[in-house]
């Protein structure tokens, strides 16, 4: 499932960036307002590139994430206009929802303005990193870096996908958010593990930022789709007791549903989708932390994607008969 938020750049921002490529603008501060990327502030060139970096520091607010599009003095070889630095400030004390939304929107912003315009990127939760001294340290760090290991490259790839959320110094990466769990949700998980119910639904209270209980029951596999909302994201655990090839099985199925407007569904607000998406791994751990194995994980956008047949095919894929290879004749003189 994509971690992109889908929040677009406003026409005003696109025009402002285009004009700045040939004008006197040094930086453009960009924020998210009403589910749109908009210009919050513009400052003109005052001195040389490095000295003007103090301007970037001056537009930051200690509690508010933002992007800064910072124009360098050198022009692009391949494109019309100047080279730019993409800056992403996300303070530690910003709200979790803001962190996730800004992290997931970074890629959209670069793509809509043209990623090739940006020759360098700075991510940090520390305001002092957005200054002349901070930039010099950033360049020294780049020059001293050893070639990336495979694991480091993977983390960088995750950053490109929008998983960066800040967290001190030069930044950090997270794979999810760990919200507190409501007592009713904990009880529901225990009841599920102890086989009191074969189905439970959990959700996220977006206002309280907490994992909450939605429902529990004993149902047949055919009823799962009717339990899944076509308008709200949700998490579902189902124990599928069945026989396969003469063996009695209890398969645990974990479903994350996030309606996207397709197949008759209604897409949830962007911030809600991001909070649910970033919580799915931690919701899964509510069950797996009890040494319970998840046999099948499904991510869907519509209840219509779930059926008994689709679940069985995922759990027990039909065997494909392999064609018998032609035998090679024995070499002459061999028995």
Curated annotation (Swiss-Prot):
Keywords recorded for this protein, A-Z: Actin-binding, Cytoplasm, Cytoskeleton, Repeat
Gene3D superfamilies per UniProt: Severin (3.40.20.10)
MF-aspect GO terms: actin filament binding; actin monomer binding; protein tyrosine kinase activity
GO cellular component, as recorded: actin cytoskeleton; actin filament; cell cortex; cytoplasm
InterPro entries: ADF-H, ADF-H/Gelsolin-like_dom_sf, Twinfilin
Domain of life: Eukaryota
ADF-H domain ranges (all copies): 4-140, 176-316
Subcellular location: Cytoplasm, Cytoskeleton; Cytoplasm, Cell cortex
Family as reported in the entry's similarity comment: Belongs to the actin-binding proteins ADF family. Twinfilin subfamily.
SUBUNIT field: Interacts with G-actin; ADP-actin form.
Main function: Actin-binding protein involved in motile and morphological processes. Inhibits actin polymerization, likely by sequestering G-actin.
Protein name per Swiss-Prot or TrEMBL: Twinfilin
């Amino acid at each position: 499932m994509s971690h992109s938020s889908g929040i677009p750049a406003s026409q005003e921002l696109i025009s402002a960036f285009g004009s700045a490529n040939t004008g006197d603008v040094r930086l453009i501060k960009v924020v998210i307002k009403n589910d749109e990327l908009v210009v919050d502030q513009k400052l003109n060139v005052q001195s040389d590139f490095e000295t003007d970096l103090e301007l970037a520091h001056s537009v930051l607010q200690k509690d508010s994430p933002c992007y800064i599009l910072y124009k360098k003095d050198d022009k692009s070889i391949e494109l019309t206009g100047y080279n730019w630095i993409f800056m992403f400030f996300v303070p530690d004390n910003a709200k979790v929802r803001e962190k996730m939304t800004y992290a997931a929107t970074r890629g959209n912003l670069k793509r809509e303005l043209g990623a090739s315009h940006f020759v360098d990127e700075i991510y940090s939760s520390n305001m002092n990193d957005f200054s002349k001294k901070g930039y010099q340290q950033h360049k020294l760090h780049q020059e001293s870096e050893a070639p990336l290991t495979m694991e480091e490259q993977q983390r960088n790839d995750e950053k490109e996908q929008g998983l960066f959320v800040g967290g001190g110094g030069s930044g950090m990466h997270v794979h999810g958010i760990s919200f507190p769990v409501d007592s009713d949700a904990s009880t529901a998980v225990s009841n599920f593990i102890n086989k009191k119910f074969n189905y439970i639904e959990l959700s996220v209270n977006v206002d309280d930022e907490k994992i909450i209980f939605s429902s529990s029951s004993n149902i047949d596999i055919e009823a799962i789709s009717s339990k899944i909302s076509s308008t709200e994201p949700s998490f579902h655990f189902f124990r599928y007791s069945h026989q396969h090839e003469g063996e009695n099985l209890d398969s645990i199925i974990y479903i994350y549903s996030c309606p996207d407007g397709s197949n008759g569904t209604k897409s949830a607000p962007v911030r809600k989708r991001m909070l649910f998406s970033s919580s799915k791994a931690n919701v899964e751990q509510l069950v797996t932390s009890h040494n319970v194995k998840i046999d099948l994980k499904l991510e869907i956008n519509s209840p219509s994607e779930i059926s008994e047949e689709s679940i069985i095919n995922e759990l027990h894929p039909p065997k494909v008969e392999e064609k018998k290879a032609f035998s090679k004749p024995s070499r002459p003189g061999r028995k």
